[in-house]
Each structure stands twice: as structure tokens, then as C-alpha cells.
Amino acid sequence: MNAHLIKLLSLSSLTAALMAAAGVARADDSQAPTFKAEPCCSLCPAAHDAKNYTTRYQQNFTTLVQAQGDWLFRTQEDLRTEFDTTPAGYRRMKELHDAFKSKGVELVVVYQPTRGLVDRNKLFPAERDKFDYDKALKNYQAMLGRFSKMGYWVPDLSPLTNEQQAHDFYFRGDQHWTPYGAQRTAKIVAETVKKVPGYSDIPKREFESHISGRMGKTGTLHNMAGQLCGTSYAIQYMDQFTTEPKGEAGDGDLFGDSGNPEITLVGTSHSGKNYNFAGFLQEYMGADVLNVAFPGGGLEGSMLQYLGSEDFQKRPPKILIWEFSPLYRLDQETIYRQMMSLLDNGCEGKPAVMSASTTLKPGTNELLVNGKNGIKDIRNGSNQIDIKFDDTSVKVLQARLWYMNGRHEDLKIEKPETSDTDGRFAFELREDEDWANQQLLALEIQGPEAGTAPQKVEAKVCKRNVFPSAATHTAQAGL
């Protein structure tokens, strides 16, 4: 389309009609207008200074790097060369795998390649030379190998790195993949899933994906640059996809005759509806997928919400696909304490070692005390706590656990604002370092803010879940 016609299409319909009446040719009705935004700007000095990334959220972007066009990168996350966790992180990941395995659930880990690995060709030469791509790729592949040795099914996504494709894998100014990136990832993941025992027994049907519209992305990296530099970047538009069963479009039956899906997807906002990752998985696997991921869920949000659901407790999947990025630390003890508790539904249906209920008032509230009816043996290494608020919208638990020797643990659990909560917080008592033999004395909970309604809550202590394992494993760095 020539420049004259582009100008014509950008005019008001009245002006365009008048010009057309004067003999100016119209563009073909089937041909959509094209738009091109010039690159916005260069980063200001403030964006290069890590001290300016002050909040916890801002620190996820430390520090921005200008690349070609409107591309931005983050030095700590996108251009990382290390992919690893602590010995405690490996131990917990192994325990989690074994617990799922004991319940007949096979876990597939989708460990995203970084934007630096995939799109280093967008960097300016000076930054590209500083980024050790070979080291990053080697360490990324080594991490995939460590997941695999722990027993996880791990798609090798390294063929996606350093790619030269017509459609961007990642957005220029955002950490999320585009629908095209999700599509290319899903194709590789599906090939791994097909090798998982039990996949052959899962009901199959054909799916097809098609472009269903356009999405505009105001990038998180672009937004951060705007906060630091006062700049404003153009919205990046991208095709959006919908996946439907072949021959069943619009029938209103999400899962057709296949019943409840036996494959579930948990993960970050990358697995959200906008990018159609679950849809592409269905297309390439030929099987239904229950997608429980939601925006803002992070590493654990959708996993915890799913584990506590009736869907999981009554109908656990044969295959659970867990998608996350190297951004997240894998040694966050509080996350595993919750997962291991919820895997067998916390204290639900189990005898209570100690229990109580009360109405919380503002400030500190004593809820459980070991000794009111005789001292009980409540060692951390063999017990868990299940707390339920009547108000299901409660998303934050602040508690202090006291022990017989005067020691205490301050515990704060925050659920994502975007999650569908049930007011429940179940977790194992702490057992890392030297905590396993601590004897629980009391549980205190912070009540609601002053001026708000009192909150009813109940708490139960019970024996923690015991998951059978074929052998005792010690997972550590360098597996």
C-alpha cells in the first residue's frame, strides 16, 4: 500500500468520501491498513542506576538496558547467565516431585528460556558482546538436566534460543511471551507430554487454533522506563488466538464427551488466556487441558489454589504441567510448606492434635496454646496447621508461632490479589535448619485493621502428610 493511500485511510470517513468522489482510488476492502510507530527514545541515566529501583516490584526490572528499536532488557533477569538454586531448593523440589508421584501425578516442568537467550540479536553490539550467551545456554541446559534427574518430565526448550523468526517470541517491552512464543513452546512441550506414562490412556480429540483478533500490549519494561524516565512507548499489537475442538466450535461444551480433563496446567501469567498457551497445548497434544493459571499468580499462586480445590482433591490429574521462569527462587521454604500440606488436603479429615476457634479483634490474638489440656508432643517435623477464616476474601495471614524454649517464628503468607481465595491457609510447621525438633507452644494471629469488622477463624494442628517414596533421596546442587 502506497503512502498516499495510508494517509487516505487515516482521514475521517467524510473527508475520505469526498476525496474518493473526486476520483481518488480507494484501497482494496480486504486489505487492512498498516501502521508503523517510530522507536520511542533512549533510556535516561536514572534507568541505569540500580539504586533507583526501590520497591520490591521495581527490583524485578534491575537494571533496564536499551536495545534496538523499542526493545528493552533487564540485566539481572533477561541477561542472566546462572540458572540454579540452593541445596535446600533442590531437596524441596525433589520432595515435591516424589509427593506428586505417590499420588499418581506426573509433573512436567516448563522452564522458560530467558529473553536474553531467545532474543539476544535485538541487543546493540556492545551489550551483546557483554552477554555471555554460550555460558547462559550451557547453564540453562544444565538446570533442565537437574530437573530431569529429580524425576520431572522436562521439555528441552533450548532450540528456541537465539531464534530468527518472523514473529517475536517475546514482546519488545514486556517479560511475557507473545502468542507466537507460546505456540512454539507448546509444540515442544507436547512432544514431551506424549512420552509420559498414562498419556496414551487419556481421551483424545482434535483441536485447531485460529487468529481471533488483535491484542495490544503496554509492556511492563516500558512502563518501568516511563516511571524512571518519563517516557512513553508505543503499544505493541499482536495476533490473538483461539483454540477449539474440530467440528465443535460454538457448541458451548468446553470438554465435549471427554469428561473431566486429565491434564492440568498451572503456572504464571504466561499461561493466561491472552497468550493461548493452554489452547496450543490442546492442539499439539490432542487432549483436553484444564487451565487453572491466572494473571499475577507467580510461581506458586495457581498451584496452591489448585491443590486446595475440590478438583484436585477428588480428581487429581494424570499429568500436571507446571510453567514458570528462572525469575523465581526455588528455595522459598514457605511455598513448599504450603504445597506439601495441601497435597493431601491439610488437616481435612484428620484427627486434631489441638484445635480452637475465635473471633479476631485488631492487634495480636492468641488462638492456640499447648498446655490448656495438658502438654502435647507437637514437634515441627511431624505436624502441620490448617487455618480457616469465615471470610473467604482474606488473602493475608500474619502469625507468630511460639516454642517451648522461648523461640518464635514470624510467618506471613500473602495470596495474589488476582486469586480466587477460600480463606484457608494450610502449612507444615517449619523444619529447615534446626527447626524440626522445636516443640510448639502457641499460635498468635494478627487481627483485622482497627475500625473493620471482627473476623471469625478456626485453627487445627494435626499430623503432617506422609508421602510414600521408593527411596530416600538427597538432592543438591550439581545433580
Q: Where are each of the predicted segments found?
A:
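Bacterial N-terminal signal peptides
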Residues: 10-21
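N-terminal secretory signal peptides that target proteins for export/translocation
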Residues: 1-7
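Extracellular glycan-modifying ectodomains
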Residues: 2, 26-479
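Intrinsic disorder/low-complexity segments
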Residues: 7-10, 344
